[in-house]
C-alpha cells in the first residue's frame, strides 16, 4: 500500500514539475497565434504575427547577426576546443588536472562577470591600439562579439570532446603508425572518426549557447544587435505578440538542435557499448 502511494506521489510530483517548467512556454506558443494583441483571452487563430515578424527589418537584421555570430563562433570554438582537448589528453596527470580545473572557471563564472571582464579587455585594447599605427582600434561591434562568443564556447567543446578522448584506445593510433601511417594520417583515419560524434555534438551546443546568449553579448556588442538583445529592447517598450512569435521560433529551433545533439550522443553511446560487447565476447 505504501509503495502504491509513493508511486502516486512520484507521478504527481513529476507532472507538477513538468507543468511548472513547460506551461509558460506552451502558453506563449498558443498566444503567438492569437488574433488579438491581448494575452488573457484567445480570440482566434492567426499567422499574422509571424507574417509581421518576417517583415520587420530590424528583427531580420538581428536574426542575421545572431546566426552569423553563432555559426562562426561555433566553428572556430569547435576547432580550438578540439585542438585543446588533444593537447590536454597528451599531458601528464597533474598538468591535465590543473588545466581542466582552470577550464572550469569560465563555465561556473557568472556571465555578467565574464561579459564585463571581456568588455574591459576590449576597451584596454582600443586604448593601446589608438597609440599604435598598425593595430585596428575600432573593433567594438561584430569583431568583439565574435571573440566573446568564441571565448565562452571553447570550454564547452573541451568538456564534450575530452571524455571521448579518454575512452579512445591509444593502441589503435599506435597500430596505425606501425602500419605505415604518419601522425597526420593516423589522426584523420583513426582518432577523428572516433571523436567526430563528440565534436559535432559540441558544435551544436556552441550554436545553441551562442544564439541564446544575452548577458555577454550585451556588454560586448557595441552598436550591433543580436536577437536576444533585440527582444529585450522590444520588451522594454511593450510586449507585442511578435515577441511571442519570435520566442516560439527560437524555442523550436533550439529544441531541434538539442534533440539532434542528444540523438547523436545516444547513437555514439550505443555504438561504444556494442563495440565493448564484441570485445568482451572475444
Residue ranges and their predicted role:
Residues 23-26, 30, 79-83, 116, ...:
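Membrane-embedded alpha-helices of multi-pass transport/permease systems
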Residues 23-57, 121, 220-222, 275, ...:
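Short membrane-interfacial helix/loop motifs at transmembrane-helix boundaries
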Residues 2-12, 162-177, 187-189, 244-282:
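C-terminal transmembrane helix and the adjacent membrane-cytosol boundary/short C-terminal tail
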Residues 13, 18-25, 151, 157-164, ...:
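Transmembrane alpha-helices
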Residues 26-37, 157, 198-232:
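Non-cytoplasmic
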Residues 2-7, 50-58, 211-268:
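Interhelical loop and adjacent transmembrane-helix boundary motif
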Residues 38-40, 47, 112-150, 184, ...:
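Membrane-interfacial helix termini and adjacent extracytoplasmic/periplasmic loops
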Residues 1-7, 72-103, 116, 120-124, ...:
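Transmembrane-helix boundary motif in ABC transporter permease subunits
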